[in-house]
Amino acid sequence: MANITAQLVKELREKTGAGMMDCKKALVQTDGDLEAAIDFLREKGLSSAAKKADRIAAEGTTYILEQGNEAIILEVNAETDFVAKNDKFQVLVSSLAEQLLTAKPASVEAALELTNAEGVKIEDQISTAVATIGEKITLRRFEIKTKTDADSFGAYLHMGGRIGVLVTLEGSTDASAAKDVAMHIAAINPTYVSRDEVSAEEVERERKVLTEQALNEGKPENIVAKMVEGRLGKYFEDVCLLDQSFVKNSDQKVRDFVASTGGSVNGFVRYAVGEGIEKREDNFAEEVMSQVKGN
């Protein structure tokens, strides 16, 4: 039998929102397997977890730079929101974006070794900023995208960079529409562009959880399969961009809005500052959606 530590119970509780005793029971039932315990709680209807309740700790900003047919989105972390709004910090972030987009390093590790025109490594540029500003600063991640003259980038920063989204519309030069799609992604936080990107393994896992949920609700076995397929459709709406109702027009699917531009979504990147590091992430969805609908 696995050793069910208090830390493991705490982690499961943070991820699911379930009660402490329910979390402990789930871990016992699944022999300490955290992912299996999450599924166990979901099957029992005890999990209130959602992707918007990720745990984060870092402050900082996201930033997007477009230059012709190239664009970069990056995240730079600091220890406090106060420093993230500091002019010197913002100048550093802008400079990093320009250097990375020019050199196109393959990784953060490679990026830190790049030198500017004065021969100073990016790692040392950051260290100098740390000494000046007085907080730890980290280049956490970045992604570079390219397009053709027939395509368009959609870039959107929410709350001055708390969330950043970069999307590419292929076959459409409607940059305004591309930005609208980026706003939608910021608000709703899809995981995939379309159902084709969802692995068969993930679909089967979700089907199993939904089946157990229906059975635990006391539904007759002869209608469970039909119910599960209906709920699976709702799952795809939650995670797939093209299946979602467009935030600026809930009567229209994103798929139809994009089709009206004559283009298609060729991928997107969405960064939320500090996601995945220990501290509860604010729920930005309602705030972003209200702002989007006002545009």
Curated annotation (Swiss-Prot):
SUPFAM superfamilies in UniProt: Elongation factor Ts (EF-Ts), dimerisation domain, UBA-like
GO cellular component, one term: cytoplasm
Highest taxon of source: Bacteria
Gene3D superfamilies linked: 1.10.286.20, DNA helicase RuvA subunit, C-terminal domain (1.10.8.10), Elongation factor Ts, dimerisation domain (3.30.479.20)
A GO MF label: translation elongation factor activity
Region (Involved in Mg(2+) ion dislocation from EF-Tu): 80-83
Residue runs in coiled coils: none
Protein biosynthesis listed as a keyword: yes
Keywords: Cytoplasm, Elongation factor, Protein biosynthesis
Pfam families: EF_TS (PF00889)
Main localization, broad class: cytoplasm
Annotated localization: Cytoplasm
Presence of the UniProt keyword Protein biosynthesis in the record: yes
Protein family (similarity comment): Belongs to the EF-Ts family.
Function field: Associates with the EF-Tu.GDP complex and induces the exchange of GDP to GTP. It remains bound to the aminoacyl-tRNA.EF-Tu.GTP complex up to the GTP hydrolysis stage on the ribosome.
Protein name: Elongation factor Ts
Species in which this protein is naturally found: Lysinibacillus sphaericus (strain C3-41)
Species lineage: Bacteria, Bacillati, Bacillota, Bacilli, Bacillales
